[in-house]
């Protein structure tokens, strides 16, 4: 019964998501799963071969690039519930095959979209939870009613690491990451370093 409930919950989430995006004027689209370039995210792709064209192709890691083409082509609001594939590790945050929703809304700035997504989560939770915005997990009761607390990326890292990022060199960041036992790759740029440190400390 528990597994059956999970399938039902997933179906409800998809229906409610479509309702929310459609009523806001979004167009749902399908973009190619087989792609000639593995783009849209920094991730290891699955590689396959197209026999008729005799070329290697990739299962998409994200729908981003095709959705952005639609924005450039004049579609101001697009979204996709995309099946994506990443040939990486498996843990509580990673699965090689997964569904994600990706959406673009032209001419809207990030603070508007943050508030709009808060309303989406509130709508979603109410829809699956008999009108209640509160959900109990193993430890806490989480209330999805907005507004949500805002956390500034730089301020949060400055506080967690007890440094000023504006005055911290890339080499110093690498040293901090190594001290934290992060498996630092020499190809990592400053952005990747900051992202990994954020995941570890914030």
PLM feature segments, named:
Residues 12, 112-115, 151, 168:
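Generic recognition of short, well-ordered alpha-helical interface segments
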Residues 118-119:
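Short amphipathic alpha-helices in soluble, non-transmembrane regions
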Residues 39-45, 123-202:
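Metal-assisted phosphate- and nucleotidyl-transfer catalytic regions
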Residues 1-112, 122, 199:
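Class II aminoacyl-tRNA synthetase-like tRNA-binding/catalytic domains
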